[in-house]
Amino acid sequence: MIIIFLNIICWIVAFICIYILLNPKTKILKNINLSPFKRRIFEKTENVDEIFKTGEKNIKKMSKKFNNNFDVMILNFNGSLNVGNIMRLSCIFGVNTFHIIGRKFYDARSCVGSDKYINIKVNKEIIKEMPDKSIIPKIDYNLFLKYLEEENLSPIFIEQGGESIINFNFNELNSLKRKSVFIFGNETNGIDKRLIRCCKKVEGFRILSIPQFGFLKSLNVSNCASIILWEHYKSNEKRKVI
């Protein structure tokens, strides 16, 4: 009976210790030097809602600390849902700045709050919208090159006919003097081929492609972005995690 009683006491003490360690209110784990991965395992019991109660400004500051030093650019998108989906993906994977080129507005509802936590730049001058929506908008190539220079960006075009992401080492982008910007084109027309040719001499210029194993003309641009950003994240030796 004494042995059984002692076993029960030991189990109770063990449960109390575990509760104290895992309870975010005790903050004991905050002072322990754990690797980011182990810290995430210990702290995953925390209530995410409590983090968001700290306010938008604080969350944006946290996002900046954990950005993975890459930008994303969308060119002349038509659909707000695609804008929002890619913005959310960019936020999740630690984007530095999200560039919207050639679109005067987007539906903030499709972003589900991600537009509050990342840097967003909208440029309405590079691509001129035409009165007739069936006509492909004109791109000012010189303004585009100037924009890349001013923002210190290396263009990584995501388009068919480029280097397969299967063979590409995303860690090469870490050695560039400029920030890498993944560029996604219009849902229907893709990226202007002449624009790509104009950027060939820009440092870090690349065209990356997602290999296709089935017979279809193209892949949805949001799905395309999710594949590219995930491949970049998982291959990046300098990636940061929360």
List the model feature ranges, each with a label:
Residues 35, 196-242:
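Structured adenosyl-cofactor binding patch, chiefly the S-adenosyl-L-methionine
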Residues 157-213:
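Active-site/ligand-binding-proximal alpha/beta "capping" segment
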Residues 8-9, 79-80, 187:
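Loop/turn elements at beta-strand to alpha-helix junctions within RNA-recognition modules
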Residues 2-27:
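Terminal signal-anchor or tail-anchor transmembrane helices
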Residues 83-84, 109-110, 166-169, 192-195, ...:
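Short glycine-/acidic-enriched loop or helix-start segments at secondary-structure transitions
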Residues 129-133, 167-168, 215-221:
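Short, charged, surface-exposed secondary-structure boundary motifs
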Residues 34-37, 42-162, 226:
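RNA substrate-binding interface of SAM-dependent RNA methyltransferases
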Residues 86-88, 113-115, 170-173, 196-200, ...:
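Short, glycine/charged-enriched secondary-structure capping and boundary segments
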